[in-house]
Amino acid sequence: MTLLQERLFAMQDKQYAAFQAKLTPGVPVESFIGIRVPVLRKFAKEFTKEAECEDFLHQLPHEYYDENMLHGLLISEVKDYEECIRLTENFLPFVDNWAVCDIMSPKVFAKHKKELSAKIKTWSKSSHVYTCRFGIETLMSHYLDKDFKTEYLEIPASVRSEEYYVKMMVSWFFATALAKQWDATISYIEQHRLAPWTHNKTIQKAIESYRITPEEKEYLRTLKIK
């Protein structure tokens, strides 16, 4: 066991490990240490100041799920854009579950929207489930507000995948887009631009959203594919 692993096990909550394992199917139960996210997030902020941090970011693959979660949190704190992209692309092939994928949210991306959009297009076309999911999630996080362009909707709309965690992210994206950019997005639902399962899941998520008006929800119900 490495020194870092010893430090991680010192934060272990075995009941939480069992809980995480149930939420993350496909990941071996024995790979969960069981560190609560707020605790791990606090540790990550301190660990970024340590010399061992850089070594850890190059030691792939990791043995434990919690190490991968830590890796994602550390990438989120990297301040140099080019370095962040390099570390992200080195790590993505090793991401094997939705939780690690979704914990990554690099703060530096917000300052580099122009360059980032090209990366998002590449990631979203990936055949690797979680690289594709990360690309769509990053688009959703950064390009549905003041930086929105209608053409960005084509990126997730063009994704063709039978992978559950990709389809769910496309649905999540379009439900969020309906909430934030209704006029530009509704035609994708009206014209059945999405696969039937994704189409209906988008409508379901949008109807569950407090950001969609009652009138919009009523209209969306008429657009379900039966």
Segments (PLM) and residue ranges:
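Alpha-helical scaffold domains
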Residues: 1-226
